[in-house]
Amino acid sequence: MPKVAVGGTFQYLHDGHARLIEKAFEIAGSGKVYIGLTSDEMLQKNHSVESYKIRRSRLLEYIKKMGVPEEKYEVTRLNDPCGPTIEEDFDHIIVSPETYPVALKINTIREKKGKKPLEIVYVEYVMAEDGIPISSTRISKGEIDRHGRLKKEA
C-alpha cells in the first residue's frame, strides 16, 4: 500500500493547497497520506500566520468534508522542512513548484543513507483570475480570496 507524503503551512487552506491534498489522496489510492503541517516554531513569514492549532483544525475539517476515512491519513507536526521523509519509508512525495527543491534535497539525503528515493509528484500552481498563482501571501494582502478571485478595490 502506497505511503504518500505532502507538507506545508496550509495557511488559509486555499485552492492550491486543496489540489496538493487531493493529488496526495489520488496517488495513495488504498494506501495512506501523511500530511506534515509546519509548526509555529519553524515559520518565518513576512506576514502573520495562524497558529498551528487553527491550521490543523481547518485542515482536518477539509479532509473530513472530502469524505476520507480517518485511517487513510495522519497529520504530523513539521519542525524542519524534511520531516519524517528522510528516515521513514514513503513511496511518493507531493510537491508544488515552491516545495520541489525540498523534495530533491530529501532524495539526495535518502540516497546517501542507502534508502530508495521518493517518487516526486509535481503539482503546478493554481492560478488566480489574474493569471498569478494563488498564495497565502496574496490572500493575506487582500489581493485575492482562497479561490483566486480578485478582491474589489474599496
UniProtKB/Swiss-Prot annotation:
- Places the protein is found: Cytoplasm
Q: Which domain of life is it from?
A: Archaea
What pathway is this protein said to act in by its record?
Cofactor biosynthesis; coenzyme A biosynthesis
Which Gene Ontology MF annotations are present?
ATP binding; pantetheine-phosphate adenylyltransferase activity
Biological process according to GO: coenzyme A biosynthetic process
Q: What are its GO cellular component terms? A: cytoplasm
Q: Does the keyword Cell membrane apply?
A: no
User: Can the keyword Transmembrane helix be found in this entry's annotation?
Assistant: no
What catalytic activity is recorded?
Answer: (R)-4'-phosphopantetheine + ATP + H(+) = 3'-dephospho-CoA + diphosphate
Pfam families reported for this sequence = CTP_transf_like (PF01467)
NCBIfam families registered for this protein in UniProt = cyt_tran_rel, PRK00777.1
User: HAMAP family from the entry?
Assistant: PPAT_arch (MF_00647)
Protein family according to the UniProt entry: Belongs to the eukaryotic CoaD family.
- According to UniProt, the name of this protein is Phosphopantetheine adenylyltransferase
